[in-house]
C-alpha cells in the first residue's frame, strides 16, 4: 500500500487531508511545521501515538494505537508527509 492508503486505512483522513484543512491540519501544513527540524519524525510519531493538543489549535488529536497502524507503516506515512511540498 502507498503511504496515502496507509494513512487513510489508519483513519488519519477523518481529520487530515492532503492540502485542505479539515478537523485537523492538512498534511501540507504539518510538513511545513516540521520540515527541517531535528528529530521531527520521532516527535511526530510520539504525537500520533500519545495524541496532542495545542500544536495546531485547540481541538485535540486522539492517540492512534499500533493496532490501527504499525510503527513501520507510521514511519512510512510520516516520511511521506514530510516530503509534501
From Swiss-Prot:
**Pfam families for the chain:** Cytochrom_C
Function field: Cytochrome c2 is found mainly in purple, non-sulfur, photosynthetic bacteria where it functions as the electron donor to the oxidized bacteriochlorophyll in the photophosphorylation pathway. However, it may also have a role in the respiratory chain and is found in some non-photosynthetic bacteria.
Q: Name one GO molecular function term.
A: heme binding
- Keywords of this entry: Electron transport, Heme, Iron, Metal-binding, Photosynthesis, Transport
Question: What's noted about post-translational modification?
Answer: Binds 1 heme c group covalently per subunit.
Q: Which GO terms describe its biological process?
A: photosynthesis
Member of which family? Belongs to the cytochrome c family.
Q: Where does heme c bind?
A: 12, 15-16, 61
Quick one: signal sequence residues? none
Tell me the PROSITE patterns matching this sequence: CYTC
Q: What is this protein called?
A: Cytochrome c2
Amino acid at each position: 500500500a502507498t503511504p496515502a492508503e496507509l494513512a487513510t486505512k489508519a483513519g488519519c483522513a477523518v481529520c487530515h487531508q492532503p492540502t485542505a484543512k479539515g478537523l485537523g491540519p492538512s498534511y501540507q501544513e504539518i510538513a511545513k511545521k516540521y520540515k527541517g527540524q531535528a528529530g521531527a519524525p520521532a516527535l511526530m510519531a510520539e504525537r500520533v501515538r500519545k495524541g496532542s493538543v495545542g500544536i495546531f489549535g485547540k481541538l485535540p488529536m486522539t492517540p492512534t494505537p499500533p493496532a490501527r497502524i504499525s510503527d513501520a507503516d507510521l514511519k512510512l506515512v510520516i516520511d511521506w508527509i514530510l516530503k509534501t511540498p
